[in-house]
Amino acid sequence: GNNIKTVDYLGFSDAYGEGWWNEFSKIAEARKIQLVGSERFNRTDTSVTGQVLKILAAKPDAVLIGGAGTPAALPQKALKEKGFKGQIYQTHGVANNDFLRVCGKDCEGTFLPSGPMLVAAQLPNDNPVKKSANDYVNKYEAANGKGSVSAFGGYAWDAGLLLANAVPAALKKAQPGTKEFRKALGSSGK
């Protein structure tokens, strides 16, 4: 989609970055997207100019930044400062206010995945997760202050909801501590 036929990758030089590269390269191949490069950077780097110049020379339609947190702002800002006009994609690891603060206007137009709690108020009323997402946001912000919600707490909330539904169903099938209970729990009690 979006007329993206070539992508370059710029990710952390650690297991996180490598994991994203490994998965993304498989998906790109399956989708007939040409990978024109694969660059790495360290979380503590203060410059990625060399990597960005290689990316610009390859002229990709898009760049996927395989990073998380505020360190992922560095390549985004460098790409924009050097004139990259293509689409930039980030991972779910940047779905937080600290990243937005550090990246500033250079983040505008970036695509990234996120759970619904970060956009709960913007979801249509008939969205099946709007009520649960708003419930989480309201409870979290009541305890921690307005604007404090993050995607990461939402993932734990989701896990809690799954357990709240799976445990009663598993208890109907087996006793806690047994192999049967673990099996029932792992299949949401079905």
Predicted features, each with a name:
Residues G1-K190:
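Extracytosolic ligand-binding ectodomains
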